[in-house]
Amino acid sequence: MRKIIVHTGYVPYDIVRTSQTFAPKGIPASFIMLTPEINIVEQTSKLLDNMNDGDILDIATNNVVTVYTIRAYVVKHADEYNVEYRYYTEDDYKLDDPSKYQLVKQGEHGDFINPPEGFFDTIDNLLNQMLGLE
């Protein structure tokens, strides 16, 4: 079994420093948001494809495309991967204690279990509002 830990929110520096991030080499931080979404999907999928049994991968990201890619990937490979999301609030960040976070699990259909308010639901909420479903 391979384990993916996704650190998100106000992630403490020590965790960012030791986790995988998806900043393309040679790209200034101010341009990271201009990375085409398909490149993010491909880069994330490739990273997950290259994991070996027993590996633990820490990823630090607030990128919705990365998180949705991980969600879909784990659903497709449910027998091989386990994922947990660690959400750090601004208060957690100020404590400077990496053990302070809210744990969010993922169900077998990619649904978040016990997510805090606003946890990667922006796209879903916006779509529901546009369709008049909320």
Regions found by a protein language model. Give the residues of each.
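Intrinsically disordered, Ser/Thr/Pro-rich regulatory regions of eukaryotic transcription factors
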Residues: 40-43
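S-adenosylmethionine-dependent methyltransferases
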Residues: 35-38
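RecA-like P-loop NTPase motor core
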Residues: 1-29, 45-49, 54, 65-134
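Structural recognition of the conserved hydrophobic beta-strand(s) that form the central parallel beta-sheet
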Residues: 56-61
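C-terminal catalytic-base region of ester-bond hydrolases, centering on the histidine
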Residues: 32
